[in-house]
């Protein structure tokens, strides 16, 4: 299925995923497309930050859902 990931710059990335994919998998796909290391990615859906070990199905993310990508910069918290 296709999902969309919107970045803070307003760019939208289209990803091909399965419901059973983990958030880790999704971050790896974003890294492939955008070169952003997964440890710098925070994915938000429906106001919730998505945890790496969970699947898209756990969050009820369905086809053509839009996730929001926020970058976590190195350094301070």
From Swiss-Prot:
Cross-link (Glycyl lysine isopeptide (Gly-Lys) (interchain with K-? in acceptor proteins)), chain numbering: 76
Cellular localization per UniProt: Cytoplasm; Nucleus
Pfam families: ubiquitin
GO cellular component: cytoplasm; nucleus
Cytoplasm as UniProt keyword: yes
Protein keywords: Cytoplasm, Isopeptide bond, Nucleus, Ubl conjugation
Propiece span(s): 77
Domain (Ubiquitin-like): residue spans on this chain: 1-76
Protein origin, superkingdom: Eukaryota
PROSITE patterns reported in the protein's UniProt record: UBIQUITIN_1, UBIQUITIN_2
Family: Belongs to the ubiquitin family.
The protein, known as: Ubiquitin
Source organism of this protein record: Triticum aestivum
